[in-house]
Amino acid sequence: MTSSSSDRSPLASQLGEVPAPLYARVKQMIVSQIQSGAWPPHHRVPSESELVSQLGFSRMTINRALRELTSDGLLVRMQGVGTFVAEPKGQSALFEVHNIADEIAARGHRHRCQVITLGEEVAGPERALALDVREGQRVFHSLIVHYENDIPVQIEDRYVNAAVAPDYLKQDFTRQTPYAYLTQVAPLTEGEHVVEAILAEPAECKLLQIERGEPCLLIRRRTWSGRVAVTAARLLHPGSRHRLEGRFSS
């Protein structure tokens, strides 16, 4: 397939001439658009069919380029919506506990959240062990999705010792995060983290607006105030939108 420079699409004219696999040339073209600022964060990337039409390459070539750029964290593919330029990855300190709303604000971005569940449950064996309470004792449960500039970046699945925070269910967590409230009523003195790489459940993929099979980063966190367990949380992040960072010295 040949075309003159006058009838090439604007995107096709950005393709490099250096010999390389076609998918690699498509990737480099998209990266150049992002790095130049022509496609800023949240910019909608042309669909596969649009790129096939504009670049003259096969759908398989375009799909591979988009898939690899998503895996690299440069693009975000949202089911039923489209593909968008990703924000630079959010990061959290590996062994510190911070308010996710503050982390997002520190990056100059907007935080909001959606409360999916907020209620009371009876502690079964697993919850009782995690919170150091008796089986059958009441505990509070909240399930919240946190957004950074309207892109879901974390599912916070949290169980709380009701005896420590009896007014937990009365809070408006669209105005302050559970972390912010709990640090007021039961200041953190000790924490425990377990970090895993997992595949999210289908319902979690829907909440995070990711495709099934996308790797996720899971942080299991327990915190104490004095010698009393306050909360046990499961924090799930899309791997393409989050990273952990730590530093140590000897």
From Swiss-Prot:
What is the name of the protein in this document? Histidine utilization repressor
MF terms in GO: DNA binding; DNA-binding transcription factor activity
Q: Which Gene3D superfamilies match?
A: Chorismate lyase-like, Winged helix-like DNA-binding domain superfamily/Winged helix DNA-binding domain
Named in its record, the pathway it takes part in is: Amino-acid degradation; L-histidine degradation into L-glutamate [regulation]
Identify the residues that the record assigns to the HTH gntR-type domain, covering every copy.
Answer: 20-88
List the PROSITE patterns hit by this protein, alphabetically.
HTH_GNTR
Q: Where's DNA bound on this chain?
A: 48-67
Physiological role: Repressor which binds to the hutP region in the histidine utilization (hut) operon. It blocks the expression of all the hut genes in the absence of inducer.
What the entry lists under CDD domains is as follows: WHTH_GntR (cd07377)
Keywords from UniProt, A to Z, are: DNA-binding, Histidine metabolism, Repressor, Transcription, Transcription regulation
Any single Pfam family the record assigns to this protein: GntR
Entry-linked InterPro entries: Bact_HTH_transcr_reg, Chorismate_lyase_/UTRA_dom_sf, His_ut_repres, Tscrpt_reg_HTH_GntR, UTRA, WH-like_DNA-bd_sf, WH_DNA-bd_sf
Q: Name one GO biological process term.
A: negative regulation of DNA-templated transcription
Where do the TM regions start and end? none
